[in-house]
Amino acid sequence: NEIKKISMMSKKDISTKELVYKFYGINNEYNIFELQKELGNKNYDKAFRISKYFSENSKKYPPQLIFASLHNYFLNLFQIKSNLKLSFSEISKLTGIYQEFILNDYRKVSVNYSLKEIVNILGIIKYYEGKSKGLMKDKYFDSELLQFISEIKT
């Protein structure tokens, strides 16, 4: 779809990055799935860059939705890590994930974290999710995602 849009533009229009970004988006690297992938692989530098972009664009990427997605990701990781001996169909029933390639990605990532680390991360996510929903009296909610990445990195 994006390639079709770009192909309809004149050659002089394509010469600026701004127009390509306008039709294609800032970057395919800046989405929740890439953030999850980078966190799963413990690539905190790239996760921090994505989080910084999300924080700077919090209307487009509300922290409440980001933290909910991260919670689901790490909860699925916990369930899969806890049940590595189960078959594909058993894990699918447990997690509600029926795409084998996604489950395989989770299995690969599961070696990067211990169960204790995952439980700790889930607790940290809940804390920052609460802050993003205004449950604490901190008004600096745009930086919560960056604080979260810094905290799980240590």
Stretches with model-predicted labels:
Residues E2, M9, F54-N83, E117-T154:
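Amphipathic alpha-helical interaction/assembly segments
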